Amino acid sequence: MQINLPLPTIILILYIIYVIFSIIMNKIKFNAENLEELDGEFIFTFISKIKKQQIYFNINEVKLCILTRIFIRQGTFKTINFNILLNDGYSLRLKKKRDCLLFLKVCREKKTELYQKILSMIPADMTVISILEKELDNFKG
């Protein structure tokens, strides 16, 4: 039994397989990201392509932290994302709410000037800052 498919059909099937594979890999990458903290020292674990990698850094090595996305619904954050630039040239992207809140909590406790700089980047009124403070107070990392 031999199946003869036209070339456009074969290309379409391969494209669908590729799209499904890339969606699955993105979900695996997102679920594998993790930020751990101990006394101002961080370990950020992520998957780059297929290999698992870790970046170790201290809160004092953070050069710049940019708030890239924030969505608030019903008085709480649904989405909050950060890009963190380190002194040695590395950059990290925190996409999970838990990781972002952990980073902000350590900034508030250990490096207040960075925390104030992050708060000044929030393009909104005091309501957003009060929601952020409430979330940080309730956060148990």
Report residues per predicted region:
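Surface loops and adjacent helix of pleckstrin homology
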Residues: 47-48, 67-70, 95-97
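Short, mixed charged/polar active-site loops
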Residues: 51-54, 89-93
